[in-house]
Structures are given as C-alpha cells and as structure tokens.
C-alpha cells in the first residue's frame, strides 16, 4: 500500500468554477480522460459523467457535490499530481463552492463562449477574490453558434474588473473551430478531425490568415505582462523580446501574486471546446505552469485554541505539527461516512489519534483514500499540501480542524449563510419516522447550509436551505439513499424580525418566593438596533459594575435574551440585528440562580422588544432575467407586479437582460410564469441578496396568518 510524501512543487490543488451549463463538468471529464484516469469520456448529456456521481446530478446534468479527484499530468519530463475539486455551479449550492475554495490553491474558471460572464460566474469570482484564489480562465463552447471569444474577454474585463492576459486566439469560428494560436510559443495547435477524442493535435506554423492578428495580440500579451512584472518591464524598456521561459515565469509570478493582494486580479485566458475535445491539453499545461503549488501559498493562519486573538501560522511542511481542515463529508454506500480533508502541515497517518481542536475531542484516523470521482486507492499516510478522504472520524463535521494534540490550532472557520427557504417534512409511515431522523442527521453533517428544527406548536420537522432546488435535492436524497418516504409541505419563506428604535431602559424582576426553593433575579437592560450593514445578528454588552449581579450569572442573562430572540414579537420569526446592554440588576444570596437570571433576561428582552418598534424582514433575491427584446415589457411588468425593484437593463448578445431585487415570497412558481410569458425563450437566475423590511400591508397579512387569525 502506498505511503505518500509528494514533492509539493509538483502538486496542484485546483477547483473548476463556472456558471451552471458553462461546460464545467464536461471540461473536468476531459481532463480526467486525457490524464488517463477515465477510460471512457462521460457525457453530461447522457448522465454518464464521472464527477457527477450522485444519481440526482446525473439526471439533472448539474454538479451538486464537490467530489475530490486525483490525476496526473506530464509536462517537460516531470509528472505532476493534480487534485481537482469539482464545484457546483448552481446558486443554491454556493456553500459547496465556498467550502471548496477554502481548500484550493488555484482555480480554472470556465466561461460559456456564447453567454460570456453570467450571474453565477460573477458570484464565484467574488468568492474566489475573497479567499485570494489565483485563477486562469477557459472560454469554452467556441464551436457553438454565436460564440465570441473577444466579447467574452471584454466581459471578464468589464464585469469582473479583472485584467485578462490573452494567451491564445481561436482558429476558425463556430462549427469551423479547429484549434488555437499559442501566443507565447507563436505556434498554431490544430486538432485533426481523425482523432475523434482529441487526444492528438499538431503544432504547426501559424496560418497566414491569422499571422497579423497573432503579431498584434502577441504584442498586447507582452505589454500586459510588462505592466505587471518588473523583470519583463526592464526587457520591454530596453526593446528586448522576452524568451518563452521568461514569459512563462513572469505569467506564473503575476497569476500567483494576483491572488494574494487586494489589487486587481490578473488572469491568463485560454480557449477551446471541451465537448468537441479541443483545447483541453494546453489548459492542463497551463494549470501546471501558472497555478500555485502548496509551497507558493502563504502559511495557513489559524488561532490559538485558548485565545482566539493569538494567531498561529503553519507552513506547508511535514516537519511542522499536523493541521488539517475537514471540508466535506460524504456518505459512501460501501464505506459509510467519508471525511474529505486538506492537510496543510505535518502528516496524517492511518491508525493514529488526532485532536478535533474545535470540539476538543480525540479522533482516530481509519483508512485513508485517494479518491477518483467514484473509485478509490488506499494509502497509509499523507503529507502537507495534499487532499484525501478519511474513514473513521466520528465527531468531526464540515469546517472543523484536525491537529496534533500537543500543538492544537483552530484554522479559520467558515461562516455559512442562514437558510432563506423552509419546508415542513413528515414521514409517511411509522417505519419512516426513524429513517427520517437518521437521514436528516447525516445530511446536516454533510451540508452546513441545511438546517433542521421542530416547530414547537405543530410538532412538525422543518428543514431549511438556500433555495427550492437545494431542498428538492435533499428530499430526493432522503428518498434514494435512505429509503425514506416523506410528505413535503409547501415552501415557506424564512422571514426575520428586527427593531427600529432604541429602548434605553427596561427593568424586570423575576420572583418566586413562596414555599420550597425560591427564585429571584432583577435585571435592567437597554436594546438598540445594529445598523451596520455587515454587523452581527446579535450582540451582548455587559455594563454591570460593583458586583451588582455576580459574574457567574451574567452569561445566563445573555442566554435568556438569545432564547427570546429565537421567537420574535410580531409573528414568532427569529430576530436579528439587536444589541442588548445589561445595565444593572440585583440578586438574592439564597434564591438567585442561573435559571432565574435566564428567565429574567428573556422576559426583559421581550418587554423591551415590544417597545422598540418591531418590524418584519423578508429575504430579497437578486434576479437576472435574460429575455428576447419583444418579451421585455411583459417581463418587467411581471417583476413589478411581484413587488420587484428594477435596477438595471442591458443588452447581451442580441438579448435583453433585466436585473432587479424581488422578495423571495413572490418568486415561487416563477419559472412556469416566465416560460408562458416568453414562450420558453427566457431564462433567469436568482440568488439571495439581503433582508429588507416588509411593507406594512403585506406584514399585517403575514402576522395574521402566523397567529392563525
């Protein structure tokens, strides 16, 4: 059995990011085919793609789970290991994307050559900016009617604010697309019609028809590189032409550096058509040439277990103590629970004990696997910089840190958004009851954006997620993987409540002093709205002095206020954006207790919230509709009728794009209405934007319904 200490300079941990349908899974499939892992090319069209291994993904033709796959690629006499994290492109699964980005060193962003930069492309681009992930771009589908390489490059510049370095020019357009001009080597790469799977291509002189454009764009390439790299700038100013090697090295430096700073992202752009097997091998060369190794990435930062203020750094070396992040949990039908782990420092060995430093619990490492999309290879140990799947972790959930128990560290935790949509779910029979509990527990372990609670009044189980598709897929998985038959209610919007006014003082005394052990707690609190846009959902400030309330009771007041926030004043929805200040209080030597102060905190909060002008908030979705011009009036009218606010309109490749903010509650069933209004020619995407106050007339209806009036 293999034990692996890879040469980290020859490792690339990459993700492939894109908008749904840009051809991301097809591109990944081709990469796996050309790197020799997959002997048959899996097509998304016929549901056979290797990465899309969950049944629902194969039916829907979209990628839901980021499966980690290891493959190998030779370049210039070296063999490189590429770990690919396949990320979903549908907005309901942005949590998966965030989680994958956290463990990547670099990424390939795939764009649809016809549609260009689409809404979800912007979302994942911004997420990659936030995590400082260096990127290269691949403009795909150049064989399609309406594909325009240069328009797509302009959109990368204008809509993403990036600086593209055009590395290739297409040879031929649409159906006649047959290869690319390599602007560094100044050669043409042409795929012959005979090699149906595109495994062979010829490196030839640039055709005369493309010579002038090649010269022009080669000049632009050198200029862009010079503007971003001092070494090439010196050559440029001296009038010297850089060599291939100098350009490769400079583009690598620029690509890696642009992920680190807060400056503009500079990104090499390649092109091809994955479906027609053209342009994928040069893309693999580019992954190796330009994307960072684990050694290029700065030391991972975490914090001390006892003191979150103390920063702890770990270099990507096997000599450092172990630090690893669990970024994905999956249920394998044969192996049970698998935890996908990125090792940042030290070594992870099968059969050893490690510490889950978030929970303070010891875990035993079972078998370690290198995963292909749906096949596996067992290894004994794994070193820094690698990504593997581990068996045997019982307590570890997504986003938690595994470390050496003598040198514990907590790596930066991931914050996941609260669900915006909920449905009630109940088992069809007694036999399904237990299975439903197991299914929900497993799915919640795998997916932190999937949340579960019981409705105290109805006793129903409520599940929440990031959108209708997200919940559909989860319910579908319950049925297929856990054999649970369940009735699912209508989707409900996750409203919130907040306050608009500051209440400077509310006194509350909790007293029960008749017979038996008494209870006594007196608190005085103030509450105010948290107005900062990125402020916390809740904040507790303690201003009690002189021991008026003993220190051990203060957290109970905080806990009581937080408990009261779970069920708002108006309609019982969770409250958000409230700062509670504990000003004063009193206690009794015998009768005071943690429980008494918790009750006092809870009741004082409720009283204060009633006086603080409570309002209802609703999730607003950023909606983008692409429609033929003749249907534009109908589309805008329809969005207005749904209480939408139109924010922008633009033209994109012959169609009109309408952007707006629309309440989620008004968007149920929108796909059918849009189809009928535009004869099926329009498409839309939406994602959560923010919470906004509900207009009074609508709020009154929601409140009345919640109270059962």
From Swiss-Prot:
Domain of life: Bacteria
GO cellular component: cytoplasm
UniProt-listed InterPro entries: EF-G-like_DII, EFG_II, EFG_III, EFG_III/V, EFG_IV, EFG_V, EFG_V-like, G_TR_CS
GO process terms (BP): ribosome disassembly
CDD domains per the UniProt record, alphabetical: EF-G, EFG_III, EFG_mtEFG1_IV, EFG_mtEFG_C, EFG_mtEFG_II
UniProt-recorded Gene Ontology molecular function terms: GTP binding; GTPase activity; translation elongation factor activity
Pfam families xref list: EF-G_D2, EFG_C, EFG_III, EFG_IV, GTP_EFTU
Residues holding GTP: 18-25, 86-90, 140-143
Chief localization: cytoplasm
Subcellular location: Cytoplasm
Alphabetic keyword roster: Cytoplasm, Elongation factor, GTP-binding, Nucleotide-binding, Protein biosynthesis
Domain (tr-type G) ranges: 9-295
Lyase listed as a keyword: no
Keyword set includes Lyase: no
Family listed: Belongs to the TRAFAC class translation factor GTPase superfamily. Classic translation factor GTPase family. EF-G/EF-2 subfamily.
Function: Catalyzes the GTP-dependent ribosomal translocation step during translation elongation. During this step, the ribosome changes from the pre-translocational (PRE) to the post-translocational (POST) state as the newly formed A-site-bound peptidyl-tRNA and P-site-bound deacylated tRNA move to the P and E sites, respectively. Catalyzes the coordinated movement of the two tRNA molecules, the mRNA and conformational changes in the ribosome.
Name of the featured protein: Elongation factor G
Source species: Streptomyces avermitilis (strain ATCC 31267 / DSM 46492 / JCM 5070 / NBRC 14893 / NCIMB 12804 / NRRL 8165 / MA-4680)
